[in-house]
């Protein structure tokens, strides 16, 4: 038997670890919950456990309970790392608390930039759909430009090309899509034909013809009178 509440919290911590090792997350959550609610836990230990509990709630898709643990942890944490801020921003977004998600992401971005670091990809990534849903296309374009600069992915280039197109920045759209095309990341007939039409619009018919010719050779574009 445990002789003190402190010893009991250590036993619960061990049982939580064993439960986790056996892939029993509900069991681990049950023991971690006892620790954070116990008067026998040291404050620092309680704080660390609260963070773990929040992560486990998130892993079991109990997002409301997860963000509450993160909020209680953040109130007393000496340092809130970028990974924790990102997790909180993602939880707010899942819970449709979009303003809080944006605010948390902005803090994470500002803290990174203040240290001369590149912000985590997830902060910008999270903000794109929120601003898009709010029709703030200028902000979406700005975020995508940062993403292609620091975390270049073809999906970001394609999204950026689409944003340029919606703003009638035709040359910028052409350049963005060309980056994707030249790296073999346009794989549908619609995308490749759109690329060719962009070059026609830019009055470069020879390049457009070459793109269509290659598309047919690669069996992406159907050989038809319409496409010849």
Could you say what each language-model-derived stretch is?
Residues 1-74:
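Post-signal peptide N-terminal segment of secreted/secretory-pathway proteins
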Residues 2-4, 36-43, 71-79, 107-117, ...:
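Solenoid-like repeat scaffolds
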Residues 5-12, 42-52, 77-87, 115-125, ...:
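Generic helix N-cap/helix-start motif at coil->alpha-helix transitions
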Residues 16, 54, 89, 128, ...:
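Conserved small-residue packing positions in alpha-helical repeats and bundles
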Residues 19, 57, 92, 131, ...:
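Residue at a conserved register position within TPR or TPR-like alpha-solenoid repeats
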Residues 22, 60, 95, 134, ...:
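Structural motif corresponding to the intra-repeat A-B loop/turn of tetratricopeptide repeats
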């Amino acid at each position: 038997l445990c002789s003190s509440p402190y010893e009991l919290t250590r036993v619960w911590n061990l049982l939580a670890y064993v439960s986790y090792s056996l892939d029993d997350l509900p069991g681990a959550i049950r023991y971690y919950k006892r620790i954070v609610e116990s008067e026998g836990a040291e404050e620092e230990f309680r704080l660390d456990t609260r963070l773990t509990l929040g992560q486990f709630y998130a892993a079991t898709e109990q997002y409301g309970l997860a963000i509450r643990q993160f909020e209680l942890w953040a109130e007393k944490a000496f340092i809130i790392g970028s990974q924790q801020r990102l997790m909180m921003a993602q939880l707010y977004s899942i819970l449709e608390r979009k303003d809080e998600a944006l605010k948390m992401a902005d803090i994470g971005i500002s803290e990174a930039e203040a240290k001369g670091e590149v912000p985590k990809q997830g902060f910008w990534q999270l903000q794109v759909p929120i601003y898009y849903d709010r029709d703030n296309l200028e902000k979406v374009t700005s975020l995508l430009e940062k993403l292609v600069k620091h975390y270049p992915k073809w999906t970001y280039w394609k999204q950026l090309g689409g944003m340029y197109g919606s703003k009638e920045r035709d040359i910028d759209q052409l350049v963005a899509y060309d980056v994707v095309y030249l790296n073999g990341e346009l794989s549908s007939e619609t995308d490749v034909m759109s690329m060719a039409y962009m070059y026609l619009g830019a009055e470069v018919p020879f390049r457009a013809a070459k793109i269509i010719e290659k598309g047919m050779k690669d069996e992406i574009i159907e050989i038809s009178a319409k496409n010849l």
